[in-house]
Swiss-Prot record:
Gene expressing this chain: degQ
Entry similarity comment: Belongs to the peptidase S1C family.
GO terms (BP aspect): protein quality control for misfolded or incompletely synthesized proteins; proteolysis; proteolysis involved in protein catabolic process
Subunit structure, as described in the record: DegQ can reversibly switch between different oligomeric forms that represent inactive (6-mer) and active (12- and 24-mer) protease states. Substrate binding triggers the conversion of the resting DegQ trimer and hexamer into catalytically active 12- and 24-mers. The conversion of 6-mer (DegQ6) into 12-mer (DegQ12) or 24-mer (DegQ24) is crucial in regulating protease activity.
Binding site for substrate: 59, 109, 139, 212-214, 230-234, 269-273
UniProt organism field: Escherichia coli (strain K12)
Protein name: Periplasmic pH-dependent serine endoprotease DegQ
GO cellular component: periplasmic space
Keyword field: Hydrolase, Periplasm, Protease, Repeat, Serine protease, Signal, Stress response
Length: 455
């Protein structure tokens, strides 16, 4: 036993000597590397940018359930009891885009229903903030820091110059942990079809984005803003490397409108259309898979005056190729009325270009699922009743869709939602922004006034 112990001790000593020798050899390496160029790092860029990315804290009260009118309870029973408004707190991120004015860009869903908004900088300072304006369709909101001092603003890049494979860095306040930076690449551009409410024309990235990152910055390696982090695809509730950001050009345009008008003024192209598909390409004998197929041109619209025709395929907008109808809709909806845009078309297989002046009319149209998924399959527009009253006209209902199953029919006119009178799509959006558990639509159909109920 004694010999064994000595042997183990000797082995230990031997190993110790060997490790020490190895350590001495390794220890000399840093001295050799010190004279070489420094390792690549994002630290210098982030040191300049982090002061411009802020944490957004909101407080407010929200109803936990929609009060059900007595006359409707017989249809739904008492399984949705009335709930009093409950206080809530929320966390998100934001980006300072104007230091002297204290303007901060964030997501609409971060500040929705907030009654108090506060901003915390990365140096620990806190400020109260007020809402300048917001837009639920694009999920953009503009805040203003009260009594700002010694702020840092972020430079904004041209997101139209992005390419798939460009490096990207996401900065925000995930889970309330504090400022966090993650890196990745631009995975895709013009991403749509995510079944989100509103406009979809996203930058996709694999830079990790989590809850609390909403409203934060997506940056290029120069530290310039290329997007506002907005959503993630998260089957399990956490990041799986598929995040989405609103392009900086779109965010900048919307922010300027909110500064100038306090709201978003949308241009109207005056067409109805759908995504280009292999079936459409085959039917028209075309070798094109991307773009927007024009199914109808509204009479008297800017497109009609410019000569756009049903059956045309819109392949580009202002010289930039279009991937989808969703991208076209998103880009037009963030352009002011009266703006002239150039459309690249394919007609009978031949390319041509037309210039369209976006309508300045206050009329509006929208796919109903952009307002609430319960109305998916219906196309809406601001309309008029026979007596001159205003409402929301049902232009089209897709057979078998949720809207059709709920009982909506073409030419119905919605005049009320949950006892609130609505005269326009904009007013309907505001009523449904609270996401009521029960939706009761008051509809004029011919000479009758009826109610349709849906969850």
């Amino acid at each position: 036993m004694k010999k064994q112990t000595q042997l183990l001790s000797a082995l230990a000593l031997s190993v110790g000597l060997t490790l020490s020798a190895s350590f001495q050899a390794v220890a000399s390496i840093p001295g050799q590397v010190a004279d070489q160029a420094p390792l690549p790092s994002l630290a210098p860029m982030l040191e300049k940018v982090l002061p411009a990315v802020v944490s957004v804290r909101v407080e407010g009260t929200a109803s936990q359930g929609q009060k059900i009118p007595e006359e409707f309870k017989k249809f739904f029973g008492d399984d949705l009891p009335d709930q009093p408004a409950q206080p809530f707190e929320g966390l998100g991120s934001g980006v300072i885009i104007n230091a002297s004015k204290g303007y901060v860009l964030t997501n609409n869903h971060v500040i929705n229903q907030a009654q108090k908004i506060s901003i915390q900088l990365n140096d620990g300072r806190e400020f109260d903030a007020k809402l300048i304006g917001s837009d639920d369709q694009s999920d953009i909101a503009l805040l203003q820091i009260q009594n700002p001092s010694k702020l840092t603003q972020i430079a904004i890049a041209d997101s139209d110059k992005l390419r798939v494979g460009d490096f990207a860095v996401a900065v925000g306040n995930p889970f309330g942990l504090g400022q966090t930076a993650t890196s990745g690449i631009v995975s895709a551009l013009g991403r749509s079809g995510l079944n989100l409410e509103g406009l979809e024309n996203f930058i996709q990235t694999d830079a990790s984005i989590n809850r609390g990152n909403s409203g934060g910055a997506l940056l290029n390696l120069n530290g310039e803003l290329i997007g506002i982090n907005t959503a993630i695809l998260a089957p399990g509730g956490g990041s799986v490397g598929i995040g989405f950001a609103i392009p900086s050009n779109m965010a900048r345009t919307l922010a300027q409108q909110l500064i100038d008008f306090g709201e978003i003024k949308r241009g109207l192209l005056g067409i109805k259309g759908t995504e280009m598909s292999a079936d459409i390409a085959k039917a028209f004998n075309l070798d094109v898979q991307r773009g927007a197929f024009v199914s109808e041109v509204l009479p008297g619209s800017g497109s009609a005056k410019a000569g756009v025709k049903a059956g045309d395929i819109i392949t580009s907008l202002n010289g930039k190729p279009l991937n989808s109808f969703a991208e076209l809709r998103s880009r037009i909806a963030t352009t002011e009325p009266g703006t002239k845009v150039k459309l690249g078309l394919l007609r009978n297989g031949k390319p041509l270009e037309v210039e369209v002046t976006l309508d300045t009319s206050t009329s509006s149209s929208a796919s109903a699922e952009m307002i609430t998924p319960a109305l998916e399959g219906a196309t809406l527009s601001d309309g008029q009743l026979k007596d001159g009253g205003k409402g929301i006209k049902i232009d089209e209902v897709v057979k078998g869709s949720p809207a059709a199953q709920a009982g909506l029919q073409k030419d119905d006119v919605i005049i009320g939602v949950n006892r609130d009178r609505v005269n326009s799509i904009a007013e309907m959006r505001k009523v449904l922004a609270a996401k009521p558990a029960i939706i009761a639509l008051q509809i004029v159909r011919g000479n009758e006034s009826i109610y349709l109920l849906m969850r």
